[in-house]
Amino acid sequence: MEIDDCNRGGPREMEQDMTTAQYFLPLATYPDSSSGLIISNAVAFAGHYGAHLHACALTVAIPHIPNAWSSLLLDTPKMIEHAETLSRDRAATLVSAATNLAASAEVELSCRTVKTTLPLLHDTAATEARFFDLAILECIADVPDTRIVAEAVIFGSGRPAIIFPNKTLVGLIDHLVVAWDGSRAAARAVNDAKPFIHKAKRVSVLSLTGEKPLPETSGAHLAEILVSSGINASATVARFTSSSIGQSIQQTALELGADMLVMGGFGHSRLRDFVLGGATDGVLENPMLPVLMSH
């Protein structure tokens, strides 16, 4: 793995201290490229919370494994060279876009390029994310690789991640909805979301009934604890009615006026394929609003 570091801060020099959050933004370059939307959303999000954004462009190295038949039919070395050049060019474009947006928004930005082999691309994203407080990700339905990267980071980094939908998000994140079922993963998500919960103007603790048995007062108890911490929190119970628990949670959160959803991520790796819980799968299949997910 090769690393190229480049620091590109905005015009504002911020004195770094222990309270400055560090956000990680992986930028894919091959076979698909990260979108410009995730860069603009990441810059806006980091700016809102006064965080230092670290963009990491992942370029690929494709090993050439000689094969007699393929050598006769294809110019494999030339194809590899083209793919690697495309990856490098996309990395330069993404880094330039991040630099310009961060400078305009006066957000502190560090950029680096990490070169890795194509099969290890997703694992590399997860490994890089371990150094930071939070990962910022995108999931686009017709770009499967974005979901693969998201799954790798969520379940392999040990860090919380925020998944953004593929649309421009404008405005402050003032109303947080916590999807609460009393589970370990949900508790972990609430703890990881504390910086956002404490800054929010309002927090709604949402429990959906009808999908699995839930303690009747669990959500209300969490809301009480949050209130005792000085947070404007309340509990809400809704009925699960749609075919997808993940979509039902998101739709209910939007109906409540949520700017961001907080939830636990359920899943485990089986032979390098992730077996996901229903809510997690539904959110990654079609994120409808920013979702902080923690595993």
What is each PLM-predicted segment?
Residues L109-C111, D145, V149-A152, D174-W180:
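Acidic/glycine-enriched edge-of-secondary-structure segments
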Residues K115-P119, A141-V143, S183-R184:
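Short beta->alpha connector loops
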Residues D4-I80, G156-R159, T168, L172-A238, ...:
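Small/aliphatic-rich secondary-structure junction motif
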Residues S35-I38, L121, T146, A186-A189, ...:
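Amphipathic coiled-coil/heptad-repeat helices and related helical stalk/stem segments
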Residues E2-R12, I39, A44, H48, ...:
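Gly/Ser-rich helix-loop-strand patches that form or flank binding pockets
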Residues E2-M18, V60-A61, S96-A135, S229-L261, ...:
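Structural beta-alpha unit
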Residues P77-T93:
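A short acidic, glycine-rich active-site loop
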